[in-house]
UniProtKB/Swiss-Prot annotation:
It comes from the Viruses. The lineage of its organism: Viruses, Viruses incertae sedis, Naldaviricetes, Lefavirales, Baculoviridae. Pfam families: Baculo_p74, Baculo_p74_N. The gene is P74. GO terms for cellular component: viral occlusion body. Belongs to the baculoviridae p74 family. GO terms for biological process: viral life cycle. Keywords: Viral occlusion body, Virulence. InterPro entries: Baculo_p74, Baculo_p74_N. This is Protein p74. Essential for virulence of baculovirus occlusion bodies for insect larvae. Signal peptide: none annotated.
């Protein structure tokens, strides 16, 4: 009989992803009602989304879930203050190290899951990152590292103080207005920074006035700057330098009531939510129940937080052609075995297909890592499959369950791919948290390599950054940001979605279990695969239970992805190695026995005569005996490690 193709498995995963996203809306509302979201529902199209079987045409949806503008702001977290990084106990406040105040330790840093934040070892693991909402209605991650460098001079170096580098007022920080680079921050000079070096703010940089240049030409710039800084009382400020208030020219730090900010953050609610309507999302609603099929006209349903719903007719008039069985043109992918274990084993052993699907999803890994991923997936997936089988009221056959397992495996790989992006974002945050100890070293080397320092510069006069430095530094950080996110140096804007934070709302096991029902529905609705073969999945024997432990063991064994040829080659190499090792070490036992005898004689002589010489002989003979005892197994395992 025919089986699902790679195209069918991918389509099943897409269907399950969209339907799970629909149910995820209610879960998000229950867990994080104060983080507002937008979503769009439309009838799925076989041309644009996934193949829609005729039996699902009235239920198949394409769902997009995103943060609203207010929700994006609520998720944002900047984790740096003037002299370090925030912790779970750091209250919300502002820095005033330049003319612009910068908020830090927002509630999203540690209050998305407060219980998790208070666990031992989680003090430095922020739960979100810093985001901005673009004119294109996207919530994107920004480059907080450059913002930290501009706003917190103390974090620029590991060793304090380096005159003119970390004992200075900060740059003014503002988001880049260029819509092509919403992730970027720009640094700007200010009067307080220029005053630190005896200059004035002129045309966006620190310079002498024309008459000061004449005086400097006569006296020398260093002498003139020294007298000017002395007159402005800057040296006394440097003796008691305050990193939180680095200059009297700067405005006072804004006052902040952290408890009030936290309470306001938690109190946000979306008053436009239609709770009764959204309850349907967990009940597999039809297009008619959602109001998306008005007299045969398909509608797109868009929800905007704090505004409500809007309906627009969708652009396409048809939802894709229905597949027609073409047995004569179908590839030979048939399988006659109705045993569930055989179906699972056969699918896993066809590693070219499975590995190809993983590559299409976006995984770039060695076969060894892929095997490990398969084993981890199967350990959790098969128990969930049994729970689904017990919980469903649908008639399930052996072949239907086997094909659902295949789709679930592909769907699990898709979920891991999504979580990889989330992990990248969290990795950036973790790197930022360690900036004062790790990135700081890189930054100081970068700074020292790009600045021309005087041989003797006790006040850091020559460490003043040139006019172009903030823009150059910002571009450098932005390049590193893109390269960290994507090894292919992609410059596409990455939108961060609520599902990237799914681990706060639901566990992986729950998500996998719920998705199995959608996968079962999709596979059961398929009548013809992408090759044009009739599936007839309901014609095999019904299955009501299976041995979970046996199936897990079978899956783990099949996940090894060994062929018979590989096994025979392994056996041949192993036998050859054992024979070589035995021939090369025939005398090891005899020599070890002789040394053990000498060890016993030396020990007896030492006990009888109490002379140090006999003890030395005893120690030498004992070490030699031990060497010859372990020599053979050591050489064997060393060779095995090299070969295998």
């Amino acid at each position: 009989m025919a089986v699902l193709t790679a195209v069918d498995l991918t389509n099943a995963s897409r269907y399950a992803g969209h339907m799970h996203r629909l149910e995820f809306i209610n879960r998000w509302r229950e867990r994080l009602p104060h983080i507002l979201i937008d979503y769009t529902l439309r009838p799925a199209s076989s041309d644009d989304d996934y193949y829609v079987p005729p039996n699902l045409r009235n239920r198949a949806l394409a769902v997009k879930l995103a943060f609203s503008r207010r929700g994006c702001d609520s998720m944002s977290c900047f984790p740096f203050h003037e002299t370090g990084v925030v912790s779970s106990q750091t209250p919300f406040a502002y820095t005033q190290t330049s003319e612009t105040s910068v908020a830090y330790a927002q509630p999203a840093c540690y209050h998305l899951d407060r219980a998790a934040a208070m666990r031992e070892g989680a003090e430095n693991e922020v739960q979100s990152a810093e985001f901005t909402y673009t004119p294109n209605n996207q919530c994107v991650l920004v480059d907080s590292t450059s913002k930290m460098y501009f706003n917190s001079p103390y974090l620029r170096t590991e060793e304090h103080t380096i005159m003119g580098v970390d004992d200075v007022p900060a740059f003014n920080v503002r988001p880049d207005p260029d819509p092509l680079f919403p992730e970027r921050f720009k640094g700007e000079f200010n009067e307080a920074y220029c005053r630190r070096f005896g200059r004035d703010l002129i045309n966006g940089g620190c310079s002498f006035r024309w008459w000061e240049s004449l005086i400097g030409f006569v006296l020398g710039d260093t002498i003139y700057v020294t007298f000017k800084m002395l007159a402005n009382n800057i040296f006394s400020e440097l003796r008691d330098f305050d990193y939180a208030a680095p200059s009297p020219l700067l405005p006072p730090r804004p006052a902040a009531d952290s408890n009030a900010v936290l309470a306001q953050w938690r109190a946000v609610r979306d008053r436009a939510v239609d709770w009764d309507f959204e309850k349907q999302f967990s009940e597999a609603p039809t297009l008619q129940q959602l109001g998306m099929d008005a007299n045969g006209v398909l509608m797109q349903l868009s929800y905007t937080a704090e505004t409500g719903f809007t309906k627009t007719p969708i652009a396409y008039s048809a939802r894709g052609a229905v597949r027609v069985a073409r047995e004569s043109r179908a590839a030979d992918r048939a399988m006659s075995d109705d045993d569930l274990e055989a179906i699972v084993a056969s699918f896993l052993e066809e590693y070219a297909l499975v590995f190809g699907i993983a590559t299409d999803i976006g995984f770039d890994m060695l076969l060894t890592a892929f095997k490990a991923m398969l084993k981890k997936i199967n350990t959790a997936l098969i128990p969930a499959l049994k729970r689904m089988l017990v919980g469903t009221s649908q008639r399930v056959t052996v072949r239907l369950l086997g094909e659902t397992y295949k789709a679930a495996l592909v769907h699990s790989m898709n979920r891991i791919a999504i979580k990889t992006l989330t992990t990248a974002a969290k990795a950036l945050t973790r790197v930022a948290i360690k900036a004062s100890s790790v990135v700081g070293i890189v930054l100081i080397l970068f700074t020292l390599a790009d600045l021309v320092l005087a041989l003797w510069d006790p006040f850091g006069y020559n460490n003043m950054f040139p006019r172009e430095f903030p823009d150059d530094l910002s571009r450098t950080f932005l390049t590193a940001y893109f390269e960290t996110l994507d090894s292919n140096t992609s410059r596409e804007i990455i939108e961060f979605l609520p599902e990237f934070f799914a681990d706060i709302v639901e566990t992986d096991d729950d998500a996998t279990f719920q998705s199995l029902f959608h996968l079962l529905d999709y596979v059961a609705a398929l009548e013809v695969n992408s090759d044009g073969q009739m599936l007839a999945l309901d014609e095999s024997d019904e299955i009501k239970d299976f041995d979970e432990a046996t199936l897990v063991g079978q899956a783990l064994a099949s996940s090894s992805l060994y062929t018979r040829l590989e096994f025979m080659q392994y056996t041949y190499r192993q036998n050859t190695l054992l024979a070589m090792n035995k021939n090369n070490n025939k005398l090891n036992g005899v020599i070890a026995g002789l040394f053990l005898t000498n060890t016993a004689v030396a020990l007896a002589a030492f006990i009888a005569h109490k002379e140090l010489t006999f003890f030395v002989y005893f120690a030498i003979f004992l070490m030699l005996a031990f060497y010859y005892l372990v020599k053979e197994p050591y050489e064997y395992f060393k060779t095995v490690d090299l070969l295998f």
